[in-house]
């Protein structure tokens, strides 16, 4: 088994437990981003992708965070900024503590972590177009400040627009850590996101994903969801996956150039056994 195969197997073990808990408690989840793309284009993982992204409507997300710590197996746990102030992200991860990995895009001691899958809250947005743009600006402003508190973890290899490059250059020269903390910014983001209910919103989604506002889509794309084959199981995804993937990725069936096929994690140890370098 390759390192990637091992990581995929661990990720599948985690996602099966998450789905089991959701099904037992009537909680709704959806595949998001590259996981939804992988299901449609590859019937499972994108071959070079090494994580799974699920989203839950805010109410179900909060219930999951309450229930999961008692129901996950002993070697799995949830972590987010509420349970650990040093946790780098706003979202929740479900970890397999028996599997140690290195998160290669992080440049500090936080890069040593456990195999995991990501759980995102799905929130609404203002229905008024102008108010929605203001809302996006406010959330992304606090997200940028949060990221700049972790300057050694900014993904500098990622493809960015000229405007984004200029903004990053300017903001990197501001002593952000003297003005705020990442925890404060996460709390502000949380307050903004919680203020917008899914019910009644024309556009919903996950602005904290890699594609930011491109992951905010018409609510009917989600609908009640639909099941898609994913490796050896079926997972719930968008009711209209084609519309969602086109909105987010454009020509999603076109494979990206090889230099843009990024991995995030590498297994170092599993069940106490060191994994040999490939």
Each model region followed by its residue ranges:
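Glycine- and acidic-residue-rich phosphate-binding/metal-coordinating active-site segment common to enzymes
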Residues: 139-143
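A short secondary-structure junction signal
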Residues: 129-135
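Active-site nucleotide-donor binding segment shared across nucleotidyl transfer reactions
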Residues: 19-52, 56, 61-62, 220, ...
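Conserved catalytic core of two-metal-ion nucleotidyltransferases
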Residues: 2-23, 65-127, 146-249, 255-278
């Amino acid at each position: 088994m390759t390192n990637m195969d091992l990581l995929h197997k661990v990720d599948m073990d985690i996602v099966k437990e998450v789905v089991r808990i959701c099904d037992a408690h009537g909680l709704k989840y959806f595949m998001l981003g590259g996981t939804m793309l992988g299901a449609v284009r590859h019937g499972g993982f994108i071959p070079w992708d090494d994580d799974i992204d699920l989203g839950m409507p805010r109410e179900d997300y909060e219930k999951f965070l309450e229930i999961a710590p008692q129901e996950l197996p002993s070697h799995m746990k949830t972590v987010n900024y509420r349970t650990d102030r040093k946790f780098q992200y706003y979202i929740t991860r479900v970890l397999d503590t028996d599997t140690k990995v290195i998160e290669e895009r992080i440049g500090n001691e936080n890069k040593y972590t456990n195999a995991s899958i990501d759980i995102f809250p799905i929130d609404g947005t203002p229905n008024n177009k102008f108010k929605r743009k203001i809302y996006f600006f406010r959330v992304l402003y606090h997200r940028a400040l949060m990221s700049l508190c972790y300057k050694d973890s900014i993904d500098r290899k990622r493809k960015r627009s000229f405007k984004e490059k200029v903004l990053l250059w300017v903001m990197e020269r501001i002593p952000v850590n003297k003005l705020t903390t990442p925890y404060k910014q996460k709390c502000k983001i949380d307050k903004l996101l919680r203020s917008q209910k899914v019910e009644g919103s024309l556009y919903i989604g996950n602005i904290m994903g890699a594609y930011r506002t491109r992951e905010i889509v018409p609510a009917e794309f989600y609908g009640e969801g639909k099941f898609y084959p994913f490796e050896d199981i079926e997972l719930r995804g968008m009711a209209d996956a084609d519309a969602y993937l086109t909105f987010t990725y454009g020509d999603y069936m076109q494979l990206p150039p090889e230099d843009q096929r990024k991995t995030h994690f590498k297994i170092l140890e599993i069940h106490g056994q060191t994994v040999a370098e490939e």
